[in-house]
Swiss-Prot record:
Alphabetized UniProt keyword annotations: ATP-binding, Nucleotide-binding, Stress response
Residue numbers spanned by region Disordered: 616-639
UniProt protein name: Heat shock 70 kDa protein 1
An example Gene Ontology molecular-function term: heat shock protein binding
SUPFAM superfamilies for the chain: Actin-like ATPase domain (SSF53067), Heat shock protein 70kD (HSP70), C-terminal subdomain (SSF100934), Heat shock protein 70kD (HSP70), peptide-binding domain (SSF100920)
Listed InterPro entries: ATPase_NBD, Heat_shock_70_CS, HSP70_C_sf, HSP70_peptide-bd_sf, Hsp_70_fam
UniProt-listed GO biological process terms: chaperone cofactor-dependent protein refolding; protein refolding
Keyword Hydrolase set for record: no
CDD domains: ASKHA_NBD_HSP70_HSPA1
Cellular component GO terms held in the UniProt record: cytoplasm; cytosol; nucleus; plasma membrane
UniProt family annotation: Belongs to the heat shock protein 70 family.
One Pfam family in the UniProt entry: HSP70
Lineage: Eukaryota, Metazoa, Chordata, Craniata, Vertebrata
């Protein structure tokens, strides 16, 4: 591959699926992976011999549930003891452990016990997306824009950025998913005049609502709301629980502790859910689900809607909140745009349509690809692309949560109110609470509650060396500065001494240290090298295997009987049989051994086979006719 050009890609790093796009020749290309799919499962699997990412990982999940990791986005930037993490762990077949209060995923890889941070798993998915883009573009890529849910907090954003760094990417910007989708929508429409657009983005694991005003290429986010923990997987969970109960009733057996049975059931439920978006009934047929019992059943759309009714209805709350924050009436919204695969569910569309008094919803953009599309446009802008339709584009995003410090009595004093356009900088002067107080503790919080104990502590630092003075006299200037990625810097200055201290809100909470990240970057390289080694090994094995079978069939071909002596034929067949037998017993041999065996085989057979082809048949060694390097793992079909 040639050296990296300055092209930048847009990656939608999703909970369940990811997608990558690039802007070139004046338009966005959403790039298909090696399986021809334009979205790639955000799955990483570890086996005794290799690591699989994407479709290959998801395809073998029922065979290897406890070492196939997904949903890393539901863990990223969170702490182990958060209630949502504890609740999720009940649904996951893989093991999550705590290390220093942070969640780590535990798997068996190549016979060893390994633990990974969520950032590392996400970085593996990002590497896959990067490779998909590189295969399409034909050169290395290092610059990227990565999207996150608008409602992601500071530590979740920071952790996503870290995942990009571990994947060897220069993350130019972290942008909000609904904002990215709005760019896709706005470019697609190109209508003049001001339009108020509500983006309703319901994906596999997260839910966002954003209201934007689009006018002449300026995208201004007015308000954002959502739930970083609601999506298609929660609907799958409801269906899985329903069928676990049904299995108990019908067969008096509990499958809830059997990982493989649960995984097969979940896959069937996900498929049924998709079917129910276009049909009123879906059947589920799983052979030998548990203890040899076949599970044949069906589910109607009405029953599915009833199972998820509270979750579906709950999606309207953030819509109302966003409208309130944007100080808009629902009649002022010109377009309601659907993004994310879960918006295909008819009931969700109906609830939303009824909420907007029967208004037609806008389905003009592809719900699976819109976010990556917008990210690719933003990537092009940041890389200095001057194509007519993107150069005038300006993106004004907002901070999703209020940010402030704790003042006397545990009160939350907000310096930056939620839905403030970013980047932004706000300064406020505070003072001491007691006479001759020598220092102050600046504690930074995010959240909307009046008391800090109900909000989320992002970090804290001390400002010391304040000269003795009566309370209320010293002037301490606190500045909050949010950059375009939504990441916060806080500084405090004692105006009398010029003494300053500051913090980038990254250290305390869920954030990896620089050393950790560097170590993970090296490990990622190591894993990549191992993956390539494994691919080469499989290629060498397949090459040897196909050569042996092809030679054997050539030697036994009746039409070639006259051209080869009985003795020669016997030698070829025997050597091939010997090689095939060796292969069966040495599946895990090294690449060099396979190549050595291939040379041995060629040494015996080449002279004999070349006699065959002297009569005007294709020249060249038998190696050429046997080049069938089928790459990659063999995948078993799984229900």
């Amino acid at each position: 591959m040639s050296a990296a050009k300055s092209v930048s890609i847009g990656i939608d790093l999703g909970t369940t699926y990811s997608c990558v796009g690039v802007f070139q020749h004046g338009k966005v290309e959403i790039i298909a992976n090696d399986q021809g799919n334009r979205t790639t499962p955000s799955y990483v699997a570890f086996t005794d011999t290799e690591r699989l990412i994407g479709d290959a990982a998801k395809n073998q999940v029922a065979l290897n549930p406890s070492n196939t990791v997904f949903d890393a986005k539901r863990l990223i930037g969170r702490r182990f003891d958060e209630p949502v993490v504890q609740a999720d762990m009940k649904h996951w077949p893989f093991k999550v452990v705590s290390e220093g209060g942070k969640p780590k995923i535990q798997v068996d890889y190549k016979g060893e016990n390994k633990t990974f941070f969520p950032e590392e798993i996400s970085s593996m998915v990002l590497v896959k997306m990067k490779e998909i883009a590189e295969a399409y573009l034909g050169h290395k890529v290092s610059n990227a824009v990565i999207t996150v849910p608008a409602y992601f907090n500071d530590s979740q954003r920071q952790a996503t950025k870290d995942a990009g760094v571990i994947a060897g990417l220069n993350v130019q910007r972290i942008i909000n998913e609904p904002t990215a989708a709005a760019i896709a929508y706005g470019l697609d429409k190109g209508k003049s005049g001001e339009r108020n657009v509500l983006i309703f983005d319901l994906g596999g694991g997260t839910f966002d609502v954003s209201i934007l005003t689009i006018e002449d290429g300026i995208f201004e986010v007015k308000a954002t709301a959502g739930d970083t923990h609601l999506g298609g997987e929660d609907f799958d969970n409801r269906m899985v629980n329903h069928f676990v109960e049904e299995f108990k009733r019908k067969h008096k057996k509990d499958i809830s502790q059997n990982k493989r049975a649960l995984r097969r059931l979940r896959t069937a439920c996900e498929r049924a859910k998709r079917t129910l978006s276009s049909s009123s009934q879906a059947s589920i047929e799983i052979d030998s689900l548990f203890e040899g019992i076949d599970f044949y059943t069906s589910v109607t759309r009405a029953r599915f809607e009833e199972l998820c009714s509270d979750l579906f209805r709950g999606t309207l709350e953030p819509v109302e909140k966003a409208l309130r924050d944007a100080k808009m009436d629902k009649g002022q919204i010109h377009d309601v745009v659907l993004v994310g695969g879960s918006t295909r569910i008819p009931k969700i569309q109906k609830l939303l349509q009824d909420f907007f008094n029967g208004r037609e919803l806008n389905k003009s953009i592809n719900p699976d690809e819109a976010v990556a599309y917008g990210a690719a446009v933003q990537a092009a802008i940041l890389s200095g692309d001057t194509s007519g339709n993107v150069q005038d584009l300006l993106l004004l995003d907002v901070a999703p949560l209020s940010l402030g410090i704790e003042t006397a009595g545990g009160v939350m004093t907000a310096l930056i109110k939620r839905n403030t356009t970013i980047p932004t900088k706000q300064t406020q002067v505070f003072s001491t609470y007691a006479d001759n107080q020598p220092g102050v503790l600046i504690q930074v919080y995010e959240g909307e509650r009046a008391m800090t104990k109900d909000n989320n502590l992002l970090g804290k630092f001390d400002l010391t060396g304040i000269p003795p003075a009566p309370r209320g006299v010293p002037q301490i200037e606190v500045t909050f500065d949010i950059d375009a990625n939504g990441i916060l810097n806080v500084s405090a200055v004692d105006k009398s001494t010029g003494n300053e201290n500051k913090i980038t809100i990254t250290n305390d909470k869920g954030r990896l240290s620089k050393e950790d990240i560097e170590r993970m970057v090296q490990e990622a390289e190591k894993y990549k090298a191992e993956d390539e080694q494994q691919r080469d090994k499989i290629a060498a094995k397949n090459s040897l295997e196909s050569l042996a079978f092809n030679l054997k069939s050539s030697a036994q071909d009746d039409s070639l009987k006259d051209k080869i002596s009985q003795e020669d034929r016997k030698r070829v067949v025997e050597k091939c049989d010997e090689t095939i037998a060796w292969l069966e017993n040495n599946q895990l041999a090294d690449k060099d051994e396979f190549q050595h065996k291939q040379k041995e085989l060629e040494k015996v057979c080449n002279p004999i086979i070349s006699k065959l082809y002297q009569g005007g048949m294709p020249s060249g060694s038998c190696r050429e006719q046997a080049r069938a390097d089928s790459q990659g793992p063999t995948i078993e079909e799984v229900d």
